[in-house]
């Protein structure tokens, strides 16, 4: 008898993609297809087999395969895109955007062909622009093309707050709005420790330092690694979003969503609070922002639009 499980395809078998695949399997959320380019098919198969051989030890029942053939991804419930190139020495930001946009379009055509009903979650940077590129190429409803950055940025924000207060991260809630970059907007006013507003627990100058560290969080890890970038926390963030979709949890999470007038912006993807469930983005939640918060979000939107200008 064939066991019918949910199916998730992870495009890109690098550190983030492989870690995402393994976490999905460990949590028994779905059978997993790990995909990379033909030149990397054997290493991709090797990683998938290695994960599968961990299943008796870890005690999970989920099938994992590695492939370069998108036919193997057919009828995926969710497709996660982590593929793309990192910025190399001498490469301009515009070159990076143009190159990764071309990669996104090629991947998206294969996804749309084999899994026309899938929900797509994009991680590839610059993620706000790449999610927009995928949306335009796929022709899917906007609710089914989502970007991941807010869960990660908020996780970093919560981590730093928990460290500052010497509390469990489980008791820290917060939200980060805007683009995934130096102009992101951690919302201190909507952040709490055990239901207590942060502003009553942490001095203003320390909060400002935490906000700034959150904005530079990815760069801090890049600097420490010396080569490469973060992948454990990004993968965990992707899995949290994927689980909310597969289980129709209707969770309030920050996600990169297509805006059509919300927050006063249109025709762009931006990090905002959403209800995430079985249909993808079930609803965009509009928070009331103070003047300085709206100004900060305006700056973030301007940064995102500047990147989008070089999309191909």
Curated annotation (Swiss-Prot):
NAD found in the keyword field = yes
Which residues, renumbered to this chain, carry the PTM Phosphoserine? 149
What molecular function terms (GO) are annotated for this protein?
L-malate dehydrogenase (NAD+) activity
UniProt keywords, alphabetically = NAD, Oxidoreductase, Phosphoprotein, Tricarboxylic acid cycle
InterPro entries reported in the protein's UniProt record: L-lactate/malate_DH (IPR001557), Lactate/malate_DH_C (IPR022383), Lactate/malate_DH_N (IPR001236), Lactate_DH/Glyco_Ohase_4_C (IPR015955), Malate_DH_type3 (IPR011275), NAD(P)-bd_dom_sf (IPR036291)
Q: Name one GO cellular component term.
A: cytoplasm
**Which family is this sequence assigned to?**
Belongs to the LDH/MDH superfamily. MDH type 3 family.
Protein known as: Malate dehydrogenase
Q: Which organism is it from?
A: Bacillus cereus (strain ATCC 14579 / DSM 31 / CCUG 7414 / JCM 2152 / NBRC 15305 / NCIMB 9373 / NCTC 2599 / NRRL B-3711)
């Amino acid at each position: 008898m064939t066991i019918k499980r949910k199916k998730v395809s992870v495009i890109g078998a690098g550190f983030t993609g492989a870690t995402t695949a393994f976490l999905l399997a460990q949590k028994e959320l779905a059978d997993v297809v790990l995909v990379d380019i033909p030149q990397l098919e054997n290493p991709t198969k090797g990683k998938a087999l290695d994960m599968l051989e961990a299943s008796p030890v870890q005690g999970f029942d989920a099938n994992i395969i590695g492939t370069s053939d998108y036919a193997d991804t057919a009828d995926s419930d969710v497709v996660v895109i982590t593929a793309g190139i990192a910025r190399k020495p001498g490469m301009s930001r515009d070159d990076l955007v143009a190159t990764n946009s071309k990669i996104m379009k090629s991947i998206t055509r294969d996804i749309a062909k084999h899994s026309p009903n899938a929900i797509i979650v994009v991680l590839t940077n610059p993620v706000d622009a790449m999610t927009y590129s995928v949306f335009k190429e796929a022709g899917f409803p906007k609710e089914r093309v989502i970007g991941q950055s807010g869960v990660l940025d908020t996780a970093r924000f919560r981590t730093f707050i928990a460290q500052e207060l010497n509390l469990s991260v489980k008791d820290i809630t917060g939200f980060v709005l805007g683009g995934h970059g130096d102009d992101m907007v951690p919302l201190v006013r909507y952040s709490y420790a055990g239901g207590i507003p942060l502003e009553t627990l942490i001095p203003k100058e320390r909060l400002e330092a935490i906000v700034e560290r959150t904005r530079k969080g990815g760069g801090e890890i890049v600097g420490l690694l010396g080569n490469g970038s973060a992948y454990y926390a990004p993968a965990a963030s992707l899995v949290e979003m994927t689980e909310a979709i597969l289980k129709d949890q209707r969770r309030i999470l920050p996600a990169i969503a297509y805006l059509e007038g919300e927050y006063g912006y249109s025709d762009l993807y931006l990090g905002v609070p959403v209800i995430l469930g079985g249909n993808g983005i079930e609803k965009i939640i509009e928070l009331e922002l103070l003047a300085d918060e709206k100004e900060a979000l305006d700056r973030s939107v301007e940064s995102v639009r500047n990147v989008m200008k070089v999309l191909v």
